């Protein structure tokens, strides 16, 4: 036999029963526009024809080969074997690779997959496959027996065939660059589940009142504070998502307002069932949830890679604060000028504040105070300060000194106790770069 394709096919079929798809997959890179089922069917027919020719030309070994391989070749060999050697044909077992399940699993995966895509409002998807180890091992054994070098994996075939048939139903397309979901097909079990990618939105929030936390803070009696996350729950309801996560460019204290530029964030909705909601509608829902205490602006869709960029790029960016500071014994113009000269442009050495030591490691931070402008308030031992600082500088501790854990501090420079009694964030330097691609 002088055909490498037929030689490879015969080596495999002499040892293993193979369905048309699993045989044809050994030669998946030969020919164009054919399915593996068509390849396998064609190879089987030509192989039977070639062996039949050799028998007719007096090759007795060819008859033995044909009769021996016929159960593994299948129904296409029955009539020829029965004609050449009546009563010799024997039924073979199921396919050694897929167990005869491949066709039915592909068909059922398309049905269930399409239902899931529609249920989750998915237009762009990819297909993944979870393959039992025994199937992968059987496939490798057949490849070794055949010795063919033009095949593909059963995973690749399932991904392609399921994807192609789903696209043919309309309304969905395979998108490897930015899929909205992944359909996972189990083989040979046949189960299908969907991994829905989160919705991600660039947005900003403003906290217009104090005692509002950024994250939801549950207690047995209910939320400890109203939160930015809680205000966004109407967005979760609107999108039909399972959970909402706020990825903000830093955070302010619960008792601090966020004013001015607002704080940049990415809003993530996990496992949404409705994806194509206009930004204006999402923003309106969020602002309704904010109850006049928190305001939002939704800007554009975001990419997953930008979540990390928001956190990385904003960890030490500049921020501007307004602080109302009480000073023991009052404060004068001389005091505020002395503060400015001592602290403006200084690098502040700051150990983790004692108030957060229970949840953060005790480390030494070096953060710069870029500018400081304080004004005494008449009739009270108070001053109002506008500070521009490097991100990560704890302003309350910059004022109080935190028992010497922050140096220099307002209290150290003034030589008496100083306390920040109000704090507002009025500007956050931010334009996180777009993620690659």
Curated annotation (Swiss-Prot):
PROSITE patterns: THUMP (PS51165). Substrate binds at residues 321, 394. Pfam families: Pus10_C, Pus10_THUMP_arc. GO terms for molecular function: tRNA binding; tRNA pseudouridine(55) synthase activity. One of its GO terms (biological process) is tRNA pseudouridine synthesis. Its EC number is 5.4.99.25. It catalyses: uridine(54) in tRNA = pseudouridine(54) in tRNA; uridine(55) in tRNA = pseudouridine(55) in tRNA. Residues 76-198 form the THUMP domain. It comes from the Archaea. Keywords: Isomerase, RNA-binding, tRNA processing. The active site is at 253 (nucleophile). PANTHER family: TRNA PSEUDOURIDINE SYNTHASE PUS10. HAMAP family: Pus10_arch. Responsible for synthesis of pseudouridine from uracil-54 and uracil-55 in the psi GC loop of transfer RNAs. Belongs to the pseudouridine synthase Pus10 family. This is tRNA pseudouridine synthase Pus10. It comes from Aeropyrum pernix (strain ATCC 700893 / DSM 11879 / JCM 9820 / NBRC 100138 / K1).
